[in-house]
Amino acid sequence: LTCVTKNTIFGITTENCPAGQNLCFKRWHYVIPRYTEITRGCAATCPIPENYDSIHCCKTDKCNE
């Protein structure tokens, strides 16, 4: 499985997930209104949202772009 780790105006950075990590995730962390910090990567299980986080998990290559 290949997941996106960064998505910038210059393109995307990906990583091949290690054995046992068969999900890609994308987490939006709301810092202040109108500003979110986005984290992407591989995971074994879908992370649990904390505070005002929103999380999307998926199982296909680069699905967390």
UniProtKB/Swiss-Prot annotation:
Protein name per the record: Muscarinic toxin 3
Tissue and organ distribution: Expressed by the venom gland.
Organism the protein comes from: Dendroaspis angusticeps (Eastern green mamba)
Other remarks on this protein: Negative results: does not show interaction with adrenergic receptors (ADRA2B, ADRB1, ADRB2), dopaminergic receptors (DRD1, DRD2, DRD3, DRD4, DRD5), histaminic receptors (HRH1, HRH3, HRH4), muscarinic receptors (CHRM1, CHRM2, CHRM3, CHRM5), and serotoninergic receptors (HTR1A, HTR2A, HTR2B, HTR2C, HTR5A, HTR6, HTR7).
Keyword Chloroplast annotated: no
Family of this protein: Belongs to the three-finger toxin family. Short-chain subfamily. Aminergic toxin sub-subfamily.
Cited Gene3D superfamilies: CD59
Gene Ontology annotations for the cellular component aspect, listed alphabetically: extracellular region
Disulfide-bond pairs as recorded: C3-C24, C17-C42, C46-C57, C58-C63
Record key words, sorted: Disulfide bond, G-protein coupled acetylcholine receptor impairing toxin, G-protein coupled receptor impairing toxin, Neurotoxin, Postsynaptic neurotoxin, Secreted, Toxin
Matches recorded under InterPro entries: Cytotoxin_Cobra (IPR003572), Snake_3FTx (IPR003571), Snake_toxin-like_sf (IPR045860), Snake_toxin_con_site (IPR018354), Toxin_cobra-type (IPR054131)
Subcellular location: Secreted
Described function: Potent antagonist (IC(50)=1-10 nM) of M4 (CHRM4) muscarinic receptors, and CHRM1, ADRA1A, ADRA2A and ADRA2C adrenergic receptors. Also antagonises ADRA1B and ADRA1D adrenergic receptors with a 10-times lower affinity.
Bilayer-spanning residue ranges: none
GO molecular function, one term: toxin activity
